[in-house]
Amino acid sequence: MCRSLRYCVSHCLYLAMTRLEEVNREVNMHSSVRYLGYLARINLLVAICLGLYVRWEKTANSLILVIFILGLFVLGIASILYYYFSMEAASLSLSNLWFGFLLGLLCFLDNSSFKSDVKEETTKYLLLTSIVLRILCALVERISGYVRHRPTLLTTVEFLELVGFAIASTTMLVEKSLSVILLVMALAMLIIDLRMKSFLAIPNLIIFSVLLFFSSLETPQNPIAFACFFICLVTDPFLDIYFSGLSVTERWKPFLHRGRICRRLSVLFTAMIELTFFILSAFKLRDTHLWYFVIPGFSIFGFFWMICHIIFLLTLWGFHTKLNDCHKVYINHRADNNSLDRIMASKGMRHFCLISEQLVFFSLLATAILGAVSWQPTNGIFLSMFLIVLPLESMAHGLFHELGNCLGGTSVGYAIVIPTNFCSPDGQPTLLPPEHVQELNLRSTGMLNAIQRFFAYHMIETYGCDYSTSGLSFDTLHSKLKAFLELRTVDGPRHDTYVLYYSGHTHGSGEWALAGGDILRLDTLLEWWREKNGSFCSRLIIILDSENSTPWVKEVRKINDQYVAVQGAELAKTVDIEEADPPQLGDFTRDWVEYNCNSTNNICWTEKGRTVRAVYGVSKRWSDYTLHLPTGSDVAKHWMLHFPRVTYPLVHLANWLCGLNLFWVCKACFRCLKRLKMSWFLPTVLDTGQGFKLVKS
């Protein structure tokens, strides 16, 4: 007994000590990374102090000494606020502002007369060491998982250091100072572009780096200090391209959730920047040396640029109009836990973004061509504006590209509920006791409420929810289903997914039992679907809560020309009454809706002994399905709806871009692998891409 007790105590102590060592190891690792960051900061401070001291020593400029002493005084105040008054935000803001300002002074003060001085050389090596330590610290932090990524455009540290650096540039002449201030704005745009993981962010970074040290950009006297400032700011967003796990809507949240007025003003701000760039480009016309090339080139490509950017600004305005509509729905349905991306998907934002992506690409192309035609290597203001416009348009292109790829398609749903106990198994009417009638009505009402909840939660447009105790005739059902299957979105194209729910009496072979002895076969329903769907690649998902849904599940697997899925249920034939209640119609609907509408549900479809089992089947080409991509007619309709007639010639160019398919070989191989998976290894849970899943037990 004592030996057992001693063993238990020693084992528990061993586990506790092992866990304590692991925690201490984690804490020590975290502390080491934090101290590495402090070392990089202190090293940079020493480099700045030494560099400013050398400039004061060699130039005897008393203003440098005053600013240097004032900077140390401000940093001392920041330390006091941090350690004695716990005012961390104010302390860090003050220190970051002055770090940017002092580093800017180190860049802009002339050092041509003492470049070979030992102290100046030491300053350069300290700055290079700061760059290495900063990159190493940022990399180790992310590899160790100590960085919590939050949605933001610019961090407070980045903003204040940029402001401080821009203030320091005012020590130069007005034209040079304006060039540097615009360059700082371009750097801010580049940081945001990288943090948003825009599709063209890396090419923009390369272009910015190549142009950064042009003499026309008024590169400071100390390029090492300038490189230190640039690299230290760009390191975090550049590494986050790989390490950040934020989704598209999470990354863009500071912009998408911004107020309506702020977003409208951002379009006007963009228009002002674009107009300024065009005016600066026109200064190239003063170059009389190559007038025979410049004047025709600027006239042609300038006109093309203006048309493309009118389209660009109208696209941004239309995007914000649709986003405002989504925000209204989001505010009204916030209690239903509907996310903004689900609402945007239901409003057809994906289709809008896919077309807008191509239009914004034309704007980027036009800007690049106009910049090349109007290239002014001696005009720093022009080059700085060029570096502002590129990431700005790249961000718009990246936003439309990512939303077009991540948002789900539009969907519409129709539900039919016919109580099954109004007739006997041979189809003859039968009288029911009053209590059974009440139970039947409650169960049918529960199914209607559940499917309406499902439609509302997943933002599925509801065509109707029909409830009939006497059944539906074939003609009535035919007219209703045809009207449902030909529904279209507000923008014109068909919905991506059509969801049809049926709960009612069925025959043994799966046909729906209708009033008057009529039946509806799956073949008949698919004929109507082919007639309405045509060449359009929409999906039809049929959800059956009936006693004989398995035949349709098996039959749908033979279909080769359409994207059709059937989700059904199997009710247990024999049930031990002592262990579980007999299954009834409506039980599957309740569980399936709960599974798809409640992320914290505890429903296990593979659980043994389930009285209601799920089963689904998909057509052979189901895995080939992709959400509808804009066709030439879609682009033309979008153009006529949103843009003036003068821009219509660009429709043909847009249609040509839509028709490009450069990776068809890779796509064909991938399609074969997905078909093999769906035919041989049908997954237990199949994500439809609309927010809900098909399941099998």
Curated annotation (Swiss-Prot):
The keyword Membrane applies. It is a multi-pass membrane protein. The chain crosses the membrane at residues 36-56, 63-83, 89-109, 172-192, 199-219, 223-243, 265-285, 293-313, 352-372, 380-400. One of its GO terms (biological process) is regulation of ubiquitin-dependent protein catabolic process. The keyword Nucleus applies. Coiled coil: none annotated. Glycans are attached at residues 111, 337, 533, 598. InterPro entries: TMEM168 (IPR029713). It is found in: Nucleus membrane. GO terms for cellular component: nuclear membrane; transport vesicle. GO terms for molecular function: sodium channel regulator activity. It comes from the Eukaryota. Keywords: Glycoprotein, Membrane, Nucleus, Transmembrane, Transmembrane helix. Plays a key role in maintaining the cardiac electrical stability by modulating cell surface expression of SCN5A. Plays a role i the modulation of anxiety behavior by regulating GABAergic neuronal system in the nucleus accumbens. Belongs to the TMEM168 family. This is Transmembrane protein 168. It comes from Mus musculus (Mouse). The lineage of its organism: Eukaryota, Metazoa, Chordata, Craniata, Vertebrata.
